[in-house]
Swiss-Prot record:
Keyword annotations of the record: Cytoplasm, Initiation factor, Protein biosynthesis, RNA-binding, rRNA-binding
Gene3D superfamilies the UniProt entry points to: Nucleic acid-binding proteins
Domain of life: Bacteria
Protein name: Translation initiation factor IF-1
Phylogenetic classification of the source organism: Bacteria, Bacillati, Actinomycetota, Actinomycetes, Micrococcales
Family of the protein in this entry: Belongs to the IF-1 family.
Role played: One of the essential components for the initiation of protein synthesis. Stabilizes the binding of IF-2 and IF-3 on the 30S subunit to which N-formylmethionyl-tRNA(fMet) subsequently binds. Helps modulate mRNA selection, yielding the 30S pre-initiation complex (PIC). Upon addition of the 50S ribosomal subunit IF-1, IF-2 and IF-3 are released leaving the mature 70S translation initiation complex.
Coiled-coil residue spans: none
Annotated organism of origin: Tropheryma whipplei (strain Twist)
Keyword Lipoprotein found: no
Any one GO molecular-function label of the UniProt entry: translation initiation factor activity
Complex formation: Component of the 30S ribosomal translation pre-initiation complex which assembles on the 30S ribosome in the order IF-2 and IF-3, IF-1 and N-formylmethionyl-tRNA(fMet); mRNA recruitment can occur at any time during PIC assembly.
Pfam families given in the database record: eIF-1a
Amino acid sequence: MAKKDGVIELEGSVLEALPNATFRVELSNGHKVLAHISGRMRQHYIRILPEDRVVVELSPYDLARGRIVYRYK
């Protein structure tokens, strides 16, 4: 899969699960963002629970929202 230009990838940990597959994630730099699960993670039924370490993609246009693209094992 090709890397997207302009996205920011950061590590974080899931604080809480919210409705509609949305999560509150605390990034490694201390910021808290709202993040939803990427389509491929939904497709493969990857479950995300609080305290999981994840990788979040942020758009440079809105740094308060992101997309969870990977869950560490």
